[in-house]
Design a protein with these regions (language model features):
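Elongated alpha-helical scaffolds
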Residues: 100-103, 115-121
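Conserved "HGTGT" condensation-loop signature of ketosynthase/thiolase-family condensing enzymes
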Residues: 1-93, 110-117, 124-272, 276-286
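Conserved phosphate-binding catalytic cores of ATP/NTP-utilizing and phosphoryl-transfer enzymes
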Residues: 102-110
Length: 286
């Protein structure tokens, strides 16, 4: 069956996990998030295979960077482009938000299907682990920034506009933080399941079993930050290394910003992938 030429396909991926050695303070020139993102992009270009690497890099319509918590870069997309050796037609930065990476993939796929772009490089990363170690050791990190006047003269696009993270009802009640909001969601789910005959303890055990399965996958993933399989009981039992964060979520059930990691995707139209000679066995349909 022929593939529609405007079908979006992922043709390359790259991941970087940097684990700081020992407990010594980090050096001032420790790799920052944009350095890790650039490395992930190079890996993704290589992953695309064959001679397509250079051709893809020279034909990037959009470089989109998920905004970081680790550092205020001004324009992280500009820095990543320079470090990765890309000259994208458009530089895009997302607003803050945990949903931004997946939403960025979705919107990119729609733009490709609509014929608006042909090749996009998506990336994101954090070096919060190094940032916090440096702060504790009073080390001033020599990480890059784009000056305000440079940003003003040539600003990146802001993908999708700033997100509204709270409803007016939540704001009126002082509910702002994820640690407040997600337990409320969980309470609503438990209430609904309770009406269906599932008691809260059974529900929590089922959720913990799902998390235990996630940890099994992480245990065999060389890029996972916490590659250790946990039992369901370990997941839900509070302790010295697994404190209760927001009932019923313990620490291991929460997202973790305290990492040095990055990832990148190359997404393009099927037509462009064929023209660039990317082997079909490298295509993944998002």
């Amino acid at each position: 069956m022929p593939v529609d030429p405007r079908t979006p396909v992922i043709v390359g991926v790259g991941q970087v996990t940097r684990r700081p050695d020992g407990i010594d303070p980090p050096a001032a020139d420790s790799p920052d998030a944009t350095a890790l993102m650039a490395e992930a992009i190079r890996l993704a270009l290589t992953d695309a295979g064959g001679h397509a690497t250079d051709q893809i890099g020279a034909r990037v319509d959009v470089l989109a960077v998920v905004n970081t918590l680790s550092w205020r870069y001004g324009d992280p997309a500009r820095i990543v482009a320079e470090r990765a050796g890309l000259e994208p037609r458009r530089r895009v930065v997302t607003p803050m938000g945990g949903n931004s990476p997946q939403a960025l993939v979705n919107s990119t796929a729609r733009s490709i299907a609509a014929g608006e772009i042909d090749v996009a490089v998506l990336t994101g990363g954090e070096t919060w682990r190094t940032r916090m170690r440096a702060r504790r050791a009073e080390v001033e990190l020599d990480w890059p920034r784009v000056e305000e006047d440079q940003v003003a003269a040539d600003p990146p696009e802001v993908w999708g506009g700033e997100l509204t993270m709270n409803s007016e009802h939540e704001t009126a009640l002082g509910v702002y933080m994820p640690v407040q909001i997600y337990p409320l969601f969980e309470s609503a789910i438990r209430a609904r399941r309770g009406a269906e005959g599932v008691d809260p303890i059974t529900h929590l055990e089922q959720v913990a079993t799902m998390w235990a399965r996630f940890s099994e996958v992480a245990a065999s993933n060389p890029y996972a930050w916490s590659p250790r399989a946990l039992s369901a009981a370990e997941v839900i039992t509070p302790g010295p290394t697994n404190r209760m964060v927001g009932a019923p979520y313990t620490k291991v059930m929460n997202s973790n910003n305290d990492v040095d990691m990055a990832a990148a995707l190359i997404v393009c139209s099927a037509e462009r992938a064929s023209a660039l000679g990317v082997p079909r066995d490298r295509w993944v349909f998002p």
